[in-house]
Amino acid sequence: MKSSGIGGQAVLEGVMMRHKNDIAVAVRKPDGNIEVGRQKTVSPKEKCKVLGWPVIRGVAAFISSLIIGIKTLSFSASFYMDEEEAKKENKKNEGAMMFGAVAFSLVLGVGIFILLPFWGAEGLMKLLGSESAVLRAVIEGVLKLGIFIGYVSLISLMKDIKRTYMYHGAEHKCISCIESGRELVPDNVMDSSKEHRRCGTSFIFFVLFISIIFFIFLRFDSLLIRLAVRLALVPVIAGISFEFIQWTGNSNTVIAGILSKPGLWIQALTTKEPTRDMVEVAIAAVEGVFDWRAYLREQGIEVSGQAAGPEEQ
């Protein structure tokens, strides 16, 4: 079926969904009710035409998604703060906080997933007494993958993170339900797949895979130059990875299916089977940005008048 064009992420006790310039965050509040917050956004390419060019648009989309993700996480967390904490948060400079959060996320990501594997690979190459660029690139890629798998597995032991992974599964199931031509009702969603080709976890796989290919061919004797090149190519690799995930996520070809598989396997680490009440929250988020009934009718599928989920609180 035609791609719905919706995507999202899990937040604290909820789900954020985005379709074009519409964003909705649905959160299960402590009192059990579902709160849905909506907002409009402007895509990077609408702000500047250059940001819509291939590869460049991937970098812009990544940064934009990071900012939106932090904002929606803050929104969901606000329901679980006590009154005094909420007042303190409201008094803070939102712009400065956002800049700090994004900067910290980028620095942490570079440190853990670029610098650590780089130095680890250099150390192993010395132990092996090898100068092979191919071996170095493969070792570095394996270390990156190992660190990522270890990281997501370790934090999944935390109760809140485990529940977030379950909401992540609910988000995926909603998209799978719609794109498989089924009505967005809890029973259908629960029976749907939690695999989603356009997921950010699959994006990470493409980043790892493409970086290995790049660094097999980019060979420099200087250790500092090798490190500088890796840092400089982060945006380029991210941009190319974005193009790949857009293609595999919207293509039904055999090749796209094969290339998607490793990302879907890794996805199993960051998505867990949700409960029915989590699915209800995800449905509320979808309905905040997307008319799934109209989408199904466009595909020639008859839609009943059955309610899709709980009433918005």
What role is predicted for each listed range?
Residues 41, 49, 59-62, 66-85, ...:
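Multi-pass alpha-helical transmembrane bundle typical of ion/small-solute transporters
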Residues 94-111, 193-217:
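Transmembrane alpha-helical segments and their cytosolic interface motifs
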Residues 2-11, 15-17, 31, 88, ...:
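Polar-ligand-bearing catalytic/cofactor-coordination segments
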Residues 79, 83-128, 132, 136-157:
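Hydrophobic alpha-helical segments characteristic of transmembrane helices
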Residues 22, 53-72, 140-165, 237-250:
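Hydrophobic alpha-helical membrane-embedded segments
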Residues 48-59, 233, 237, 275, ...:
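Short, charged, low-complexity patches
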Residues 75-79, 106-129, 207-231, 235-238, ...:
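Juxtamembrane "helix exit" motif at the C-terminal ends of alpha-helical transmembrane segments
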Residues 1-74, 78-81:
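Divalent-cation
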